[in-house]
């Protein structure tokens, strides 16, 4: 038999008092475990020194152990099996990491170190024209990322701008791997493109569901959900409804992702219901406006001019999709039958409103981007040839 994750809190007004009580507690635990034929693991036993924050006026100030005055940097000396227990900057208890200030920075760091490498490796297996498809990546996301981040969220997650920024940075890296969009794509657009709630809203949903399962009322986005024993499913649906309302308000208020919002996905609920939308390397560029477009590359100082090499017009996703004469043949064959020759945003909305429309967009994006690359390569070779003749 074995037991796991035992936590002991020892209080004291001085270091000597804590050490005295701590030694007595350790001795008592070892004796009790021995009586039932259990051993306490010396290598897995760690401690953390939590110092009471000092109060300046009416505000508590967090203590950094490295900045403590004389005697503050020395670890407590409490032995187990003849060896001093190691005192760490952060510890893990029941799967949740916390630091000396009982904050969640350590847990966020743990999530980043665990999840980012995993999805980075998956990104390598999901290249633009081969490897894992969007459906497989989405399944891994729902089965690995969401449960891992939301685990015990009712105990560690606290709403706050700093916390949300850390978690959103982590989430953004994962979404880029799933949607195969460019790294310059905003977090707001990446969430909508993937059809998944922003992570801070997802955590609020997880916390609300936890309280409802415990038979308690839940609060999300300022809305109180009254627990009804006979209607837990209805309670969950109401939580998700409020979460989507929060997401929609956030999407409409965002100053980022304009190309995605105005042309393709003004409504987040409609996007989530459109399960036929499975972004790849090519469609992500069209749906976000971030990609192989001179206008965007010029903004990033990666292209000499913002104009299209074919017609001289601003080279962006809308021009590429509906206007550039170089791709008229592909457009007439694939896009026009779906859009009916309408202009944006009616035409672009029609391309994502049905499986047939998105299939046409996907094929057009693939062949048109390949054609564009060939045209630019031919133009580059021509310019190099002219330059060589001029030098001769």
Swiss-Prot record:
EC class (word): transferase
GO molecular function, one term: RNA-directed DNA polymerase activity
Entry's EC annotation: 2.7.7.49
Location of the region described as Nucleic acid-binding endonuclease in the Swiss-Prot/TrEMBL record: 231-392
Catalytic activity: DNA(n) + a 2'-deoxyribonucleoside 5'-triphosphate = DNA(n+1) + diphosphate
Annotated Reverse transcriptase domain residues: 1-230
Keywords: Endonuclease, Hydrolase, Nuclease, Nucleotidyltransferase, RNA-directed DNA polymerase, Transferase, Transposable element
Name the record gives this protein: Retrovirus-related Pol polyprotein from type-1 retrotransposable element R1 4
């Amino acid at each position: 038999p074995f037991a796991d994750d035992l936590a002991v809190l020892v209080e004291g007004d001085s270091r000597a008092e804590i050490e005295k009580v701590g030694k007595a507690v350790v001795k008592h635990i070892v004796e009790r475990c021995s009586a039932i034929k259990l051993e306490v693991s010396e290598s897995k036993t760690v401690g953390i020194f939590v110092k009471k924050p000092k109060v300046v006026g009416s505000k508590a100030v967090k203590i950094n152990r490295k900045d403590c005055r004389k005697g503050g940097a020395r670890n407590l000396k409490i032995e187990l099996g003849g060896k001093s227990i190691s005192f760490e900057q952060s510890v893990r208890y029941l799967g949740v990491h916390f630091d000396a200030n009982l904050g969640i920075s350590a847990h966020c760091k743990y999530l980043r170190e665990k999840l980012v490498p995993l999805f980075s490796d998956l990104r390598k297996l999901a290249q633009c024209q081969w490897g894992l498809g969007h459906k497989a990546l989405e399944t891994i996301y729902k089965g690995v990322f969401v449960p891992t981040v939301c685990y015990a969220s009712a105990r560690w997650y606290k709403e706050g701008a700093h916390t949300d920024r850390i978690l959103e940075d982590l989430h953004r890296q994962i979404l880029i791997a799933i949607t195969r969009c460019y790294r310059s794509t905003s977090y707001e657009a990446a969430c909508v493109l993937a059809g998944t709630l922003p992570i801070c809203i997802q955590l609020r949903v997880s916390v609300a569901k936890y309280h409802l399962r415990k038979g308690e009322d839940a609060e999300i986005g300022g809305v109180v959900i009254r627990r009804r024993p006979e209607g837990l499913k209805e309670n969950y649906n109401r939580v998700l409804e409020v979460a989507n309302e929060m997401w929609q308000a956030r999407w409409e208020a965002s100053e980022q992702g304009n190309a995605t919002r105005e042309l393709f996905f003004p409504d987040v609920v409609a996007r989530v219901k459109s399960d036929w939308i499975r972004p790849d390397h090519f469609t992500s560029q069209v749906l976000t406006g971030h990609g192989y477009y001179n206008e965007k590359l010029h903004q990033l100082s990666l292209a000499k001019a913002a104009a299209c090499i074919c017609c001289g017009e601003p080279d962006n996703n809308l021009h590429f999709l509906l206007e550039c004469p170089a791709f008229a043949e592909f457009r007439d064959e694939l896009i026009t039958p779906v859009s009916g020759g309408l202009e944006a945003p009616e035409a672009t909305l029609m391309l994502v409103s049905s499986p047939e429309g998105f299939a046409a967009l996907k094929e057009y994006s693939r062949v048109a981007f390949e054609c564009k690359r060939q045209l630019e390569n031919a133009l580059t070779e021509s310019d190099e040839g002219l330059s060589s003749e001029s030098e001769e």
